[in-house]
UniProtKB/Swiss-Prot annotation:
InterPro entries xrefs: MraZ (IPR003444), MraZ_C (IPR035644), MraZ_dom (IPR020603), MraZ_N (IPR035642), MraZ_sf (IPR038619), SpoVT-AbrB_dom (IPR007159), SpoVT-AbrB_sf (IPR037914)
Keyword Transferase: no
Protein's UniProt name: Transcriptional regulator MraZ
Upper taxonomic lineage: Bacteria, Pseudomonadati, Pseudomonadota, Betaproteobacteria, Burkholderiales
Species of the source: Burkholderia multivorans (strain ATCC 17616 / 249)
Protein family membership: Belongs to the MraZ family.
Length: 142
């Protein structure tokens, strides 16, 4: 289970050091294998490979009228492995798609991660908070 936010930096080659608290889980759960793809909100999704296979099967089973969503999620997916220093390489294509340059935010989302450009994430989070709670959370107890 992945949770929490980590402010990270991409190096000149587009590599991101995975926080130590996640490395052991990724090694144990997925032998260090991760799949990265686009998300329509403007971030990237990072899945441990077994979780990716579950997600991939759901996307592949979508009806024909969702063929563009298959292209977005599956057509842009790239398999990567943690290197010996605990880093993953984010491809130039995916970095460009999510506007990632140097400062990024990695968010644990349970079974997977979201990877955001730091400034984009801050702006979207502030906009969401300014809108107030959605109806789905109105009766939620904190």
């Amino acid at each position: 289970m992945f949770q929490g936010a980590s402010a990270l930096t991409l190096d000149a080659k587009g590599r991101m050091s995975v926080p130590a608290r996640y490395r052991e889980a990724l090694q144990g759960q997925a032998e260090g294998r991760v799949t990265v793809t686009k998300h329509p909100d403007g971030c990237l999704l990072l899945f441990p490979r077994p979780e990716w296979e579950v997600f991939r099967a759901k996307i592949a089973a979508l009806p024909m009228d969702a063929h563009w969503w298959r292209r977005i999620f599956l057509g842009n997916a790239m398999d990567v492995d943690l290197d010996s220093a605990g880093r993953i390489l984010v491809s130039p294509e995916l970095r460009m798609a999510a506007g990632l340059e140097k400062e990024v935010m990695l968010l644990g989302m349970g079974s997977h991660f979201e990877l955001w450009d730091s400034q984009t994430y801050i702006a979207k989070e502030q906009a969401a908070m300014a809108q107030g709670m959605p109806d789905a959370l109105k009766n939620f107890t904190f």
